[in-house]
Amino acid sequence: GSTIGSVVDSWIVSSLAPTQRIEGPRLDSLRITSSTEGAVIPRVFGRMRMGGTIIWATDFREETRTTTQGGGKGGGGGKVKTTEYLYFASFAVALCEGPITGIGRIWADGKLLDTAGITWRWYPGDEAQTADPFITAKMGAANTPAYRGTAYVVFEDLPLSNYGNRLPQLSFEVFRPLADPDTAEGLTRAVTMIPASGEFAYATQAIRKGGGGAQVSENLNALSDTPDMVVALDRLQAIAPKVESVSLVVAWFGDDLRAGSCKVRPGVEVSAKSTTPASWSVNGVSRASAFLVSRDDQDRPIYGGTPSDFAVVQAIQVMKARGLRVTFYPFILMDVPPGNTLPNPYSDNAAETGQLAFPWRGRITCSPAAGFAGTVDKTATAASQVAALFGAATPASFSVSGQSVSWTGTSGDWGLRRMVLHYAHLCAAAGGVDAFLIGTEMPGLTTIRSSASAYPAVQAYRALAADVRSILGAGTKISYAANWSEYFGHQPQDGSGDVFFHLDPLWADPEIDFVGIDNYMPLSDWRNGFDHADAAEGWPAIYDRAYLQGNIAGGEGFDWFYASATDRSAQVRTAITDGAGKPWVFRTKDLRAWWSNPHYNRP
């Protein structure tokens, strides 16, 4: 009875106790009290972070939120009623003279603004833009200017609670390429999409790792609500609107410079990671069973992982949907870490221990390599090493289900053919691509000989091209992307004086549609200051257009070359000559002569 009485007493007392009321801060005025009249409208060229000027605003909108707490256990204790005042601002900010091509990041009070959930839009500032519909609804059509010629941004109901119930200081990343078509932005027609690695770098949907409230975005680094791939394409097309074609680079990992021992596999950054709404998978290989890339001395992965297959499909489809032509570019990153104990093929009898760390894929070759004691070059052993690198995959070694491609061949086959044919199937599953490369920059491989004049890798690439054609069909252009030092021929450095146009059988193959060259030919030999050869010839600067144009079909690789590193340091130049009267044979830059003249081997 006493317990019941106590509860009743508490209820009576609490019902008689006054309710405690707490109110948060409230603004005395809901108006923006300052503006700028007569401010200069800036001009922007390129990309710039800049502030702006408010050109229109409504009064702040006030929202009241009341919560009640208290009563205590059994109804005891007084109540606490809390009232908060929330404020929202709708306004427009003029940025610069238009037209601009895009807005990138936005900062509020110096911090990146998370635009997820915020209603905002931008106007380019051209002479055809129409009035903003939100401003029109507030002001009426007759009273709403279109602000033609001025780029501006409109925010609707921006929450102000994080900024002390005031408008934050806003700044914007603005893109405005030069109107002059004779600029990099105006002239660029094709680009390469890298980094080639990154497990979800090419995904067009947001990918998050972890579970519950601890999720972290994998591919929302540029903007908080837009995948990086989409941001990259938006900015590309805004900055370089004439771009028509994109090469999509996707990497697997090689682990040895010896062709006969090298495995080429898809890799991951960590072997255990949960991601949503999609998991990593390449060629049917799961994360747990994939090759794990090397890590540095701070336990960070040296490379990003191979892009997941679904991300590659998404990238191809989104680029095609934007009207871009897609070239697929398979890439090999060499994961040979420092301190390795692998036999070095670039040593006599391959007896030296330790290969160069993280080398260029173009150094994959036979072992021992040509030019070293014990070399297997020009022997049947070299051919068998090349065959081991390519592997035995066929177009039938894969299972295709929708947009998923899995391996059904021999489990230990990690050859080049498996990689390339996998991506041929994947590109077909994505709806096709405009061009497909069967290999890129492999001079150490393509110059391997099985006899004095037989190049087994060249024949292997021809067979691979035919298999890729059977998957992708006649609508896809197929080629090999030769290194700039590789495309024109092979001149063995053995004192023989031999000259072979070793890639000609590949270039002439009916399944090859064009000559592909990764062109990094030297365009200048300018040194610091003016005490050097090119300045002595009267050229005023490295940026001089005539100087650079003169080195397209001239200068290093055309008129002369450096015979050694010592000669390069001292600018001791050796003229390119040919006793047979055809110096173009040795000119890496002489594309015109290489294309125009008959090719004759000089064994």
Regions found by a protein language model. Give the residues of each.
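Polar, S/T/G-rich
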Residues: 3-189, 194-200, 211, 215-218
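Substrate-binding cleft and catalytic face of glycoside hydrolase catalytic domains
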Residues: 189-210, 244-453, 477-485
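Stable alpha-helical elements in mature extracytoplasmic
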Residues: 4, 225-232, 308-315, 382, ...
